[in-house]
Amino acid sequence: MTGQTAPAAPEDANVLGLPETKVRKFNINFGPQHPAAHGVLRLVLELDGEVVERVDPHIGLLHRGTEKLMEARPYAQTIPYFDRLDYVAPMNQEHAYCLAIEKLLGVEVPVRGLLIRTLYDEIGRILNHLLNVTTQAMDVGALTPPLWGFEEREKLMIFYERASGARLHANYYRVGGVRQDLPPELVQDISDWCDAFPKILDDIEGLITDNRIFKQRNVDIGVVTKEEAIAWGFSGVMVRGSGIPWDLRRSQPYALYSEMEFDIPLGVNGDCYDRYLCRMQEMRESTKIMKQCCERLLKTSGPVLVDDHKVSPPRRGEMKRSMEALIHHFKLYTEGYRTPPGDVYACVEAPKGEFGVYLVSNGTNKPYRCKIRAPGYPHLQAMDWMNRGHMLADVSAILGSLDIVFGEIDR
């Protein structure tokens, strides 16, 4: 036998006498009832085998015309609409809207009101990240983290309820401050929770951070470079996971963030795993901020709402003694206050990214136009670009790392 090899058979489909078949692309619907869709998302996926070639997001299934509805209501009656946008962390959205109106009116918020706002913004951040991190783990097969995460979320929901009376749609922030002061017992309970929470985070990290399966499903999946993050208009963890140190709490401080000590976690690779690590570390930093707020709230006292009865209602006792207070109360709850004509943009570092409100006033008691800049919207529009070339199983991992809630996308 010589070392020569036999000539290869010609590359012809009919060598074996088989009919020639064309490989066709396969289209499937992902959602809107899929548990990994995180809401009413419908994705039409075009697959070549198991490789994703195209993703077409269909949105609008939760559209309620929020921006248009706001044009028919006085300013004070439009605050509850913001609770229903990103309903995982409602108070952060209220904050942006109140900031916009305060800019128009030139209202100064008392220090204690700013402290409470800062505290509850960070509670919202932890509520959001706990839900995102644990459900992302569930999407790739881990069932224990959601149980532990929801136990802590329940405690935070009770803090919401003790401050505002509602677990979810709080309607707690007001133009000029917050609706009512926090009792010292509540502040102490939040402080005690801050002491215990890092241990819970350690337990959750012990389950999934170095888990081989979790890393295989997230490392080098959905990579976003710095340039791509900026080009797509990303914000929040989506840019910080790619290594861009952009956080509005530092770069454009509002409330009392300029007086707080905290670090901004950054990723290196810009993949799903780095975004997960950023969120885990952000929860630790939020706990630090909450602890600082609790210490200051326990040591100080003062008003939580601006003492201007053209904007904030007078107290009940005052209304029984003063006719002016009664008139102010009546005018506030029937007509509301008027803002000077002009336009203003206010934004906050919401858990999902930069949540902005562009408010146009025509001098009446209602917004002429209120444009909401939802951080999840530019993230979702990049789904097609981020998923191309990935496997079908990676779609849910990428979607989970984007952190999408449909209240704010469809509005």
UniProtKB/Swiss-Prot annotation:
One of its GO terms (cellular component) is plasma membrane. It is an enzyme of class 7 (translocase). This is NADH-quinone oxidoreductase subunit D. The keyword Cell membrane applies. It comes from the Bacteria. NDH-1 is composed of 14 different subunits. Subunits NuoB, C, D, E, F, and G constitute the peripheral sector of the complex. Its EC number is 7.1.1.-. GO terms for molecular function: NAD binding; NADH:ubiquinone reductase (non-electrogenic) activity; quinone binding. It catalyses: a quinone + NADH + 5 H(+)(in) = a quinol + NAD(+) + 4 H(+)(out). The keyword Transferase does not apply. It comes from Phenylobacterium zucineum (strain HLK1).
